[in-house]
Amino acid sequence: MAKNLVIVESPAKAATIEKYLGKNEYTVKASMGHLRDLPKSQLGIDVEARFEPKYIVVRGKNDLLKELLKQAAQADKVYLATDPDREGEAIAWHLAALLNISPQDPCRIEFNEITKTAVVEALKHARIIDDNKVNAQQARRVLDRIVGYKLSPLLWKKVRRGLSAGRVQSVAVRLICDREREIEAFEVTEYWSIHATMQKNDTSAASFEAELSTFEGKKLAISSAEMAESTIKELSQAEFLVEQVKRGDRQRKPYPPYITSTLQQDASHKLGYSAKKTMMLAQQLYEAGHITYMRTDSTRVSNEAQAQARQWVEANLGTRFLPATPPQYAKKAAQDAHEAIRPSLPEVSVNELPATLSRDQKRVYELIWKRFIASQMRPAIFDTMAVVIAAGKYGLRANGSILRFPGYLAVYSDAAEGQATAANDKLLPPLVESEPLTAEEIRPEQHFTEPPARFTEAAL
């Protein structure tokens, strides 16, 4: 019989950890989530006694509980290795109560990544269960139950049977309704812009686009077709001279590593995945040992992971892509000391993952890997050029930029993130102040103001 029992939440996580620890000294079992919860048939909260919750064993889990009790009785030591968040802490607390583990027993271990090094290190630093985390989860669970059980019947009565209300869901509905009222109240306004195709006298140079911006030094607003036509008529009779040329550079910094919300948003925008699907895939990658824990609001990264990322960049791209010191992405008020979402082994790119992973799993891993590696690299640098063109009382502007150093963009090959210039940037020909120009074409464009967009799942 194994000397130690380790309890985790899922069979996949159990299999990965048992592979690292071996079966001779450790048995790893899964609790399949919560073993104890509030009853479904009643409120389950004593509102007269400081909102004390009344827990029961989850239906269908009595046999599992008996098996865990048997294993715990035969083990020299029980370790509770549930997820490293409030929910995981609460599951560990329930397990300790059901398995008769003393509150003072240092039985709780946690790790942000399922690697052999992380698991073995966690076993060396077992601690007692954190009551503050447990109480935070219980407060949330009690509030969920009160809101759901009190509001849902009202919805049944006033709207339709079968509807439900929740602590988060109800607030989201309010946000959606408020936005819809903004949209309904929005009044569309017409406006126009004037664009000119400019050409140097040296016709071998490429033409470029400029936009009308000022009249007598003040910002110009064109509100009608008639005003646009009269403006174009005046411009067509004006002389165009380069009034000002400003050259400079612009840095485009990499984003910090993912947290839960930014991963969900990017997976929605770039992959078309729902938040639920993204978290399911991330959970699978975490349990298989490929990424760190995916429920986090921290952008902190361990020194070891940063060093591994820098080694990959140096070996594959060169030292010029590395900043002198590893970047720090500090975020105050993170719920705990979790790391950001990152690859467990930064040197493993998507092409080196096991063939057993699905296409969807690999796509999410690639998002996480690229974002993390890029976050440890130097910014991209663009040479910029801003030109002011005088045309009588009018002023036009043109902006251009060209990529001088790709920096973190070297990691990306997709157009969504790795494109060299922004969509509104243009390459301008060499220009000097007082240089005359010719307007090959002057054209108006009609626009209408748009109401606020409806929320997408990612935006919410």
Annotate each PLM feature.
Residues 2, 83-84, 160-164, 247-256, ...:
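Conserved short loop/turn motifs at secondary-structure junctions
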